[in-house]
Protein backbone atom coordinates (compact mmCIF):
# COMPACT_ATOMS: atom_id res chain seq x y z
CA UNK A 1 0.00 0.00 0.00
CA UNK A 2 1.82 3.11 -1.22
CA UNK A 3 -0.44 5.48 0.74
CA UNK A 4 1.13 4.34 4.01
CA UNK A 5 4.65 4.69 2.54
CA UNK A 6 4.12 8.30 1.48
CA UNK A 7 2.24 9.48 4.57
CA UNK A 8 3.53 7.29 7.41
CA UNK A 9 6.83 5.87 6.13
CA UNK A 10 5.64 2.31 6.69
CA UNK A 11 4.76 -0.67 4.51
CA UNK A 12 1.51 -2.61 4.77
CA UNK A 13 1.17 -6.22 3.71
CA UNK A 14 -2.44 -6.98 2.73
CA UNK A 15 -1.84 -10.27 0.96
CA UNK A 16 -2.33 -12.69 3.86
CA UNK A 17 -5.56 -14.45 4.74
CA UNK A 18 -6.89 -14.10 8.25
CA UNK A 19 -6.13 -17.07 10.46
CA UNK A 20 -5.84 -17.79 14.14
CA UNK A 21 -3.31 -20.61 13.75
CA UNK A 22 -0.14 -19.45 15.50
CA UNK A 23 2.20 -21.30 13.14
CA UNK A 24 0.59 -19.79 10.04
CA UNK A 25 0.66 -16.29 11.54
CA UNK A 26 4.35 -16.72 12.41
CA UNK A 27 5.06 -17.99 8.88
CA UNK A 28 3.32 -14.98 7.30
CA UNK A 29 5.15 -12.50 9.55
CA UNK A 30 8.50 -14.19 8.92
CA UNK A 31 7.94 -14.12 5.15
CA UNK A 32 7.03 -10.41 5.23
CA UNK A 33 10.10 -9.60 7.34
CA UNK A 34 12.42 -11.64 5.10
CA UNK A 35 11.15 -10.00 1.89
CA UNK A 36 11.40 -6.55 3.50
CA UNK A 37 14.93 -7.24 4.75
CA UNK A 38 16.01 -8.41 1.31
CA UNK A 39 14.51 -5.28 -0.29
CA UNK A 40 16.37 -3.05 2.18
CA UNK A 41 19.71 -4.85 1.84
CA UNK A 42 19.86 -5.26 -1.95
CA UNK A 43 21.99 -2.73 -3.78
CA UNK A 44 20.47 -3.36 -7.20
CA UNK A 45 17.74 -5.47 -8.74
CA UNK A 46 16.70 -6.69 -12.16
CA UNK A 47 13.00 -6.66 -12.96
CA UNK A 48 12.35 -9.78 -15.00
CA UNK A 49 9.85 -12.56 -14.72
CA UNK A 50 11.23 -15.97 -13.91
CA UNK A 51 9.16 -18.95 -15.04
CA UNK A 52 7.91 -21.08 -12.17
CA UNK A 53 7.89 -24.32 -14.15
CA UNK A 54 5.96 -27.49 -13.42
CA UNK A 55 6.73 -27.60 -9.70
CA UNK A 56 5.68 -24.44 -7.83
CA UNK A 57 6.50 -25.97 -4.43
CA UNK A 58 10.16 -26.46 -5.41
CA UNK A 59 10.38 -22.96 -6.92
CA UNK A 60 8.93 -21.35 -3.77
CA UNK A 61 11.16 -23.42 -1.48
CA UNK A 62 14.27 -22.26 -3.34
CA UNK A 63 12.98 -18.66 -3.11
CA UNK A 64 12.59 -19.06 0.67
CA UNK A 65 16.15 -20.39 0.87
CA UNK A 66 17.43 -17.38 -1.10
CA UNK A 67 15.67 -15.15 1.43
CA UNK A 68 17.72 -16.80 4.17
CA UNK A 69 15.00 -18.95 5.72
CA UNK A 70 17.46 -21.82 6.13
CA UNK A 71 17.89 -24.14 9.06
CA UNK A 72 15.83 -25.93 11.66
CA UNK A 73 14.51 -22.69 13.18
CA UNK A 74 12.62 -21.99 9.93
CA UNK A 75 11.44 -25.55 9.27
CA UNK A 76 7.95 -24.87 10.61
CA UNK A 77 7.73 -21.62 8.62
CA UNK A 78 8.64 -23.41 5.38
CA UNK A 79 6.16 -26.19 6.15
CA UNK A 80 3.25 -23.77 6.61
CA UNK A 81 4.12 -21.72 3.51
CA UNK A 82 4.54 -24.79 1.27
CA UNK A 83 1.73 -27.04 2.49
CA UNK A 84 -0.91 -25.86 -0.01
CA UNK A 85 1.33 -25.74 -3.09
CA UNK A 86 1.23 -28.62 -5.58
CA UNK A 87 4.40 -30.54 -6.29
CA UNK A 88 7.29 -31.93 -4.30
CA UNK A 89 9.33 -29.19 -2.60
CA UNK A 90 12.42 -31.40 -2.38
CA UNK A 91 12.67 -32.43 -6.04
CA UNK A 92 12.52 -30.28 -9.18
CA UNK A 93 11.11 -33.12 -11.29
CA UNK A 94 9.55 -36.44 -10.37
CA UNK A 95 11.97 -38.10 -7.96
CA UNK A 96 11.86 -41.37 -9.93
CA UNK A 97 13.57 -39.62 -12.88
CA UNK A 98 16.79 -39.12 -10.91
CA UNK A 99 19.38 -41.85 -11.39
CA UNK A 100 20.75 -41.60 -7.85
CA UNK A 101 17.26 -42.05 -6.38
CA UNK A 102 16.61 -45.10 -8.59
CA UNK A 103 19.95 -46.73 -7.67
CA UNK A 104 19.34 -46.27 -3.97
CA UNK A 105 15.84 -47.75 -4.08
CA UNK A 106 16.61 -50.67 -6.40
CA UNK A 107 19.35 -51.86 -4.03
CA UNK A 108 17.00 -51.67 -1.08
CA UNK A 109 19.22 -49.05 0.52
CA UNK A 110 16.42 -46.58 1.27
CA UNK A 111 17.40 -43.78 3.61
Predicted regions and their residues:
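C-terminal accessory/tail domains of diverse enzymes
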Residues: 1-111
Amino acid sequence: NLHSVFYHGTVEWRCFESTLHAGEVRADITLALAVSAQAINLEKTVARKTPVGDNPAFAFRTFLLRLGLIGPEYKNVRMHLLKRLPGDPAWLRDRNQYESYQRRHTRGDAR
